[in-house]
Amino acid sequence: MVKEYLKKISEGKHLTFDEAKEIVLSIDREEITEAQLGAVLLGLRLKGENPEEIAGFVDVLHEKAKKIPNRTPAVDVCGTGGDKSNTFNISTAVAFTLASLGVRVAKHGNRAMSSKAGSIDVIEALGFKCSDNPEEIARDIDEKGIGIIFAPYFHPVVGKAVKVRRELGIGTIFNMAGPMLNPANLSGQILGVYSEKVMRNMAEASLILKKDNILFYHGKDDGIDEISLSGKTIFAYLKNGKIDYFDFSPEDIGIKRYQKEEFKGGDAQENAKILEDIFKGVAKESHIDIVAVNSAFALWVLGKVKSVKEGFDMVKEHIMKGKVYEFVETLRGRTA
Protein backbone atom coordinates (compact mmCIF):
# COMPACT_ATOMS: atom_id res chain seq x y z
CA MET A 1 0.00 0.00 0.00
CA VAL A 2 2.79 2.43 0.92
CA LYS A 3 4.48 1.79 -2.43
CA GLU A 4 1.25 2.74 -4.23
CA TYR A 5 1.12 6.02 -2.31
CA LEU A 6 4.78 6.68 -3.07
CA LYS A 7 4.14 6.17 -6.78
CA LYS A 8 1.20 8.57 -6.64
CA ILE A 9 3.24 11.22 -4.84
CA SER A 10 6.17 10.79 -7.25
CA GLU A 11 3.78 11.58 -10.11
CA GLY A 12 2.88 14.87 -8.42
CA LYS A 13 -0.60 13.71 -7.41
CA HIS A 14 -2.17 14.55 -4.06
CA LEU A 15 -3.17 11.87 -1.57
CA THR A 16 -6.78 11.72 -0.45
CA PHE A 17 -7.75 12.36 3.17
CA ASP A 18 -8.04 8.60 3.79
CA GLU A 19 -4.74 7.82 2.06
CA ALA A 20 -2.96 10.39 4.23
CA LYS A 21 -4.53 8.75 7.29
CA GLU A 22 -3.21 5.38 6.13
CA ILE A 23 0.32 6.75 5.96
CA VAL A 24 0.13 7.82 9.61
CA LEU A 25 -1.44 4.52 10.65
CA SER A 26 1.40 2.68 8.92
CA ILE A 27 3.86 4.74 11.00
CA ASP A 28 1.97 3.83 14.16
CA ARG A 29 1.90 0.12 13.24
CA GLU A 30 5.57 0.32 12.20
CA GLU A 31 4.70 -1.07 8.77
CA ILE A 32 6.59 1.63 6.88
CA THR A 33 10.37 1.54 6.59
CA GLU A 34 12.53 4.56 7.38
CA ALA A 35 13.47 4.83 3.70
CA GLN A 36 9.80 4.81 2.67
CA LEU A 37 8.83 7.37 5.31
CA GLY A 38 11.65 9.67 4.28
CA ALA A 39 10.56 9.36 0.65
CA VAL A 40 6.92 10.10 1.55
CA LEU A 41 7.79 13.18 3.60
CA LEU A 42 10.20 14.52 0.99
CA GLY A 43 7.78 13.76 -1.85
CA LEU A 44 4.94 15.60 -0.11
CA ARG A 45 7.23 18.55 0.51
CA LEU A 46 8.42 18.72 -3.11
CA LYS A 47 4.93 18.59 -4.64
CA GLY A 48 3.44 20.73 -1.86
CA GLU A 49 1.20 19.42 0.91
CA ASN A 50 -2.50 20.13 0.38
CA PRO A 51 -5.31 20.60 2.96
CA GLU A 52 -6.64 17.02 2.65
CA GLU A 53 -3.20 15.57 3.35
CA ILE A 54 -2.62 17.85 6.34
CA ALA A 55 -6.10 17.02 7.67
CA GLY A 56 -5.49 13.28 7.28
CA PHE A 57 -2.26 13.47 9.25
CA VAL A 58 -3.81 15.63 11.99
CA ASP A 59 -6.89 13.39 12.28
CA VAL A 60 -4.90 10.26 13.15
CA LEU A 61 -2.17 11.97 15.17
CA HIS A 62 -4.76 13.70 17.35
CA GLU A 63 -6.78 10.51 17.75
CA LYS A 64 -3.66 8.65 18.97
CA ALA A 65 -2.55 11.43 21.34
CA LYS A 66 -2.85 11.19 25.12
CA LYS A 67 -5.58 13.67 26.05
CA ILE A 68 -5.59 16.38 28.73
CA PRO A 69 -8.91 16.18 30.67
CA ASN A 70 -9.22 19.85 31.63
CA ARG A 71 -12.75 20.76 32.70
CA THR A 72 -12.48 24.43 31.75
CA PRO A 73 -11.94 24.97 28.00
CA ALA A 74 -8.63 26.71 27.33
CA VAL A 75 -6.90 28.67 24.59
CA ASP A 76 -3.59 27.79 22.93
CA VAL A 77 -1.14 30.29 21.49
CA CYS A 78 1.61 28.82 19.34
CA GLY A 79 3.39 28.97 16.00
CA THR A 80 4.80 26.66 13.40
CA GLY A 81 8.29 28.09 13.72
CA GLY A 82 10.45 27.73 10.64
CA ASP A 83 10.38 31.44 9.74
CA LYS A 84 14.16 31.74 10.36
CA SER A 85 13.61 35.18 11.93
CA ASN A 86 15.02 34.29 15.37
CA THR A 87 12.51 36.45 17.24
CA PHE A 88 12.18 36.02 21.00
CA ASN A 89 9.41 33.68 22.16
CA ILE A 90 6.48 36.03 21.67
CA SER A 91 3.70 33.43 21.87
CA THR A 92 5.13 32.11 25.15
CA ALA A 93 5.00 35.62 26.60
CA VAL A 94 1.43 35.92 25.32
CA ALA A 95 0.45 32.64 27.00
CA PHE A 96 1.50 33.86 30.46
CA THR A 97 0.00 37.30 29.82
CA LEU A 98 -3.38 35.81 28.93
CA ALA A 99 -3.30 33.51 31.96
CA SER A 100 -2.56 36.50 34.20
CA LEU A 101 -5.74 38.09 32.82
CA GLY A 102 -7.83 35.10 33.90
CA VAL A 103 -7.90 33.29 30.55
CA ARG A 104 -7.33 29.53 30.84
CA VAL A 105 -4.29 28.58 28.72
CA ALA A 106 -3.10 25.17 27.48
CA LYS A 107 0.39 25.99 26.17
CA HIS A 108 1.41 23.27 23.73
CA GLY A 109 5.08 23.44 22.77
CA ASN A 110 8.38 21.78 22.05
CA ARG A 111 12.10 22.30 22.24
CA ALA A 112 13.97 24.24 19.57
CA MET A 113 13.91 22.73 16.08
CA SER A 114 15.02 25.55 13.76
CA SER A 115 15.42 28.40 16.28
CA LYS A 116 17.86 28.88 19.16
CA ALA A 117 15.15 28.45 21.79
CA GLY A 118 11.82 26.63 21.63
CA SER A 119 8.93 27.51 23.92
CA ILE A 120 9.70 24.64 26.29
CA ASP A 121 13.37 25.64 26.52
CA VAL A 122 12.34 29.14 27.60
CA ILE A 123 9.60 27.97 29.96
CA GLU A 124 12.17 25.79 31.73
CA ALA A 125 14.59 28.73 31.84
CA LEU A 126 11.81 30.70 33.58
CA GLY A 127 11.86 28.06 36.32
CA PHE A 128 9.00 25.77 35.35
CA LYS A 129 9.05 22.00 34.85
CA CYS A 130 7.01 20.03 32.33
CA SER A 131 4.84 17.21 33.60
CA ASP A 132 3.97 14.11 31.59
CA ASN A 133 0.86 13.54 33.73
CA PRO A 134 -2.37 14.54 31.90
CA GLU A 135 -4.33 14.88 35.16
CA GLU A 136 -1.70 17.17 36.68
CA ILE A 137 -1.68 19.42 33.60
CA ALA A 138 -5.49 19.51 33.61
CA ARG A 139 -5.40 20.66 37.26
CA ASP A 140 -2.85 23.33 36.37
CA ILE A 141 -5.17 24.65 33.64
CA ASP A 142 -8.29 24.52 35.81
CA GLU A 143 -6.78 25.79 39.07
CA LYS A 144 -3.64 27.79 38.22
CA GLY A 145 -4.80 29.17 34.87
CA ILE A 146 -2.06 27.69 32.68
CA GLY A 147 -0.84 24.20 31.86
CA ILE A 148 2.38 23.42 29.98
CA ILE A 149 2.10 20.57 27.45
CA PHE A 150 5.45 19.24 26.22
CA ALA A 151 4.39 17.78 22.87
CA PRO A 152 6.64 14.65 22.79
CA TYR A 153 5.04 13.36 26.01
CA PHE A 154 1.62 13.26 24.39
CA HIS A 155 2.16 12.28 20.74
CA PRO A 156 3.66 8.76 20.55
CA VAL A 157 3.18 8.43 16.78
CA VAL A 158 5.09 11.65 16.14
CA GLY A 159 7.91 10.18 18.22
CA LYS A 160 8.18 7.23 15.84
CA ALA A 161 9.03 9.62 12.99
CA VAL A 162 11.59 11.74 14.87
CA LYS A 163 14.69 9.89 13.62
CA VAL A 164 13.68 10.20 9.95
CA ARG A 165 12.67 13.85 10.34
CA ARG A 166 15.95 14.69 12.04
CA GLU A 167 17.96 12.96 9.30
CA LEU A 168 15.98 14.76 6.57
CA GLY A 169 16.71 18.09 8.23
CA ILE A 170 13.91 19.94 6.43
CA GLY A 171 10.42 21.07 7.31
CA THR A 172 7.77 18.43 6.61
CA ILE A 173 4.04 17.95 6.97
CA PHE A 174 4.66 17.22 10.66
CA ASN A 175 5.64 20.88 11.13
CA MET A 176 2.18 21.88 9.90
CA ALA A 177 0.34 19.19 11.84
CA GLY A 178 2.17 19.75 15.14
CA PRO A 179 0.57 23.06 16.20
CA MET A 180 -2.87 21.61 15.37
CA LEU A 181 -2.48 18.69 17.80
CA ASN A 182 -3.10 20.27 21.20
CA PRO A 183 -4.51 17.40 23.30
CA ALA A 184 -6.39 19.65 25.74
CA ASN A 185 -10.01 20.77 25.62
CA LEU A 186 -9.81 24.08 23.71
CA SER A 187 -12.23 26.98 23.28
CA GLY A 188 -10.01 28.76 20.77
CA GLN A 189 -6.55 28.97 19.29
CA ILE A 190 -4.33 31.60 17.71
CA LEU A 191 -1.71 30.04 15.49
CA GLY A 192 1.18 31.73 13.71
CA VAL A 193 2.40 30.28 10.41
CA TYR A 194 5.67 30.79 8.51
CA SER A 195 4.11 31.31 5.05
CA GLU A 196 0.86 32.54 3.56
CA LYS A 197 0.32 29.43 1.44
CA VAL A 198 0.81 27.09 4.39
CA MET A 199 -1.48 29.29 6.51
CA ARG A 200 -4.28 28.93 3.98
CA ASN A 201 -3.74 25.17 3.72
CA MET A 202 -3.79 24.75 7.50
CA ALA A 203 -6.98 26.79 7.78
CA GLU A 204 -8.66 24.68 5.09
CA ALA A 205 -7.42 21.48 6.76
CA SER A 206 -9.00 22.63 10.04
CA LEU A 207 -12.26 23.30 8.20
CA ILE A 208 -12.20 19.72 6.83
CA LEU A 209 -11.75 18.48 10.42
CA LYS A 210 -14.70 20.63 11.58
CA LYS A 211 -12.55 22.57 14.03
CA ASP A 212 -13.72 26.01 15.11
CA ASN A 213 -12.57 29.37 16.46
CA ILE A 214 -8.98 29.31 15.21
CA LEU A 215 -7.16 32.44 14.10
CA PHE A 216 -4.26 31.69 11.75
CA TYR A 217 -1.85 34.50 10.90
CA HIS A 218 1.36 35.31 9.05
CA GLY A 219 3.49 38.44 9.19
CA LYS A 220 3.53 39.06 5.45
CA ASP A 221 6.02 41.92 5.17
CA ASP A 222 8.67 40.43 7.46
CA GLY A 223 7.84 36.72 7.05
CA ILE A 224 7.32 35.87 10.73
CA ASP A 225 4.88 33.49 12.41
CA GLU A 226 3.64 36.26 14.71
CA ILE A 227 1.26 39.19 14.45
CA SER A 228 3.75 41.76 13.24
CA LEU A 229 4.48 45.34 14.24
CA SER A 230 6.96 45.72 11.36
CA GLY A 231 4.40 45.55 8.56
CA LYS A 232 1.21 43.90 7.40
CA THR A 233 -0.15 40.69 8.95
CA ILE A 234 -2.61 38.49 7.05
CA PHE A 235 -5.20 36.35 8.80
CA ALA A 236 -7.42 33.35 8.14
CA TYR A 237 -10.14 33.16 10.80
CA LEU A 238 -12.05 29.88 11.01
CA LYS A 239 -15.36 30.45 12.76
CA ASN A 240 -18.78 28.80 12.43
CA GLY A 241 -17.82 26.64 9.47
CA LYS A 242 -16.27 29.32 7.25
CA ILE A 243 -12.92 31.02 6.80
CA ASP A 244 -12.65 34.81 6.66
CA TYR A 245 -9.46 36.42 5.33
CA PHE A 246 -8.36 39.90 6.40
CA ASP A 247 -5.22 41.87 7.18
CA PHE A 248 -3.91 44.17 9.89
CA SER A 249 -1.29 46.91 10.07
CA PRO A 250 -0.04 48.55 13.30
CA GLU A 251 -1.45 51.90 12.18
CA ASP A 252 -4.96 50.40 12.26
CA ILE A 253 -4.99 50.78 16.05
CA GLY A 254 -2.54 53.65 16.37
CA ILE A 255 0.65 51.71 17.05
CA LYS A 256 3.89 52.83 15.48
CA ARG A 257 5.89 50.44 13.32
CA TYR A 258 9.14 48.99 14.56
CA GLN A 259 12.10 47.51 12.71
CA LYS A 260 12.06 43.72 12.55
CA GLU A 261 15.42 43.65 14.34
CA GLU A 262 13.73 45.03 17.47
CA PHE A 263 12.32 41.57 18.15
CA LYS A 264 15.48 39.50 17.78
CA GLY A 265 16.02 36.90 20.47
CA GLY A 266 18.88 34.70 21.62
CA ASP A 267 19.21 31.42 23.46
CA ALA A 268 16.80 30.16 26.11
CA GLN A 269 18.39 32.13 28.96
CA GLU A 270 18.50 35.36 26.94
CA ASN A 271 14.88 34.98 25.85
CA ALA A 272 13.78 34.18 29.40
CA LYS A 273 15.38 37.48 30.51
CA ILE A 274 13.47 39.32 27.75
CA LEU A 275 10.22 37.73 28.95
CA GLU A 276 10.95 38.55 32.61
CA ASP A 277 11.43 42.22 31.66
CA ILE A 278 8.17 42.21 29.71
CA PHE A 279 6.32 40.62 32.63
CA LYS A 280 7.71 43.30 34.97
CA GLY A 281 6.68 46.06 32.56
CA VAL A 282 10.25 47.35 32.25
CA ALA A 283 11.08 46.01 28.77
CA LYS A 284 11.49 48.06 25.61
CA GLU A 285 8.18 49.48 24.40
CA SER A 286 8.47 47.48 21.17
CA HIS A 287 8.58 44.21 23.15
CA ILE A 288 5.62 45.17 25.31
CA ASP A 289 3.63 46.34 22.28
CA ILE A 290 4.10 43.13 20.28
CA VAL A 291 3.06 40.97 23.23
CA ALA A 292 0.09 43.26 23.88
CA VAL A 293 -1.15 43.17 20.28
CA ASN A 294 -0.82 39.38 20.00
CA SER A 295 -2.65 39.03 23.33
CA ALA A 296 -5.33 41.45 22.15
CA PHE A 297 -6.15 39.32 19.11
CA ALA A 298 -6.51 36.28 21.38
CA LEU A 299 -8.90 38.18 23.65
CA TRP A 300 -10.89 39.26 20.59
CA VAL A 301 -11.15 35.68 19.30
CA LEU A 302 -12.40 34.58 22.72
CA GLY A 303 -15.00 37.36 22.82
CA LYS A 304 -13.39 39.01 25.85
CA VAL A 305 -13.09 42.40 24.13
CA LYS A 306 -15.13 44.12 21.43
CA SER A 307 -12.12 45.27 19.43
CA VAL A 308 -8.41 44.62 19.10
CA LYS A 309 -7.78 48.26 20.06
CA GLU A 310 -9.68 47.80 23.33
CA GLY A 311 -7.73 44.62 24.02
CA PHE A 312 -4.38 46.22 23.21
CA ASP A 313 -4.92 49.17 25.55
CA MET A 314 -6.10 46.88 28.36
CA VAL A 315 -3.21 44.42 28.01
CA LYS A 316 -0.54 47.11 27.73
CA GLU A 317 -1.74 48.78 30.93
CA HIS A 318 -1.85 45.38 32.66
CA ILE A 319 1.75 44.63 31.63
CA MET A 320 3.04 48.09 32.56
CA LYS A 321 1.64 47.66 36.09
CA GLY A 322 3.70 44.47 36.53
CA LYS A 323 0.59 42.30 36.86
CA VAL A 324 1.98 39.53 34.64
CA TYR A 325 5.09 39.32 36.80
CA GLU A 326 2.97 39.07 39.96
CA PHE A 327 1.08 36.16 38.39
CA VAL A 328 4.25 34.39 37.24
CA GLU A 329 5.82 34.78 40.70
CA THR A 330 2.70 33.25 42.24
CA LEU A 331 3.04 30.27 39.88
CA ARG A 332 6.66 29.93 40.99
CA GLY A 333 5.55 29.90 44.62
CA ARG A 334 6.97 33.31 45.38
CA THR A 335 5.53 36.67 46.36
CA ALA A 336 6.22 39.37 43.80
UniProtKB/Swiss-Prot annotation:
SUPFAM superfamilies recorded: Nucleoside phosphorylase/phosphoribosyltransferase catalytic domain, Nucleoside phosphorylase/phosphoribosyltransferase N-terminal domain
Record-level GO BP terms: L-tryptophan biosynthetic process
Binding annotation for Mg(2+) 2: D225, E226
Cofactors (names): Mg(2+)
Record-listed anthranilate 1 binding positions: G79, N110
GO cellular component: cytosol
Catalytic activity: N-(5-phospho-beta-D-ribosyl)anthranilate + diphosphate = 5-phospho-alpha-D-ribose 1-diphosphate + anthranilate
Protein name: Anthranilate phosphoribosyltransferase
Source species of the chain: Dictyoglomus thermophilum (strain ATCC 35947 / DSM 3960 / H-6-12)
Name of the encoding gene: trpD
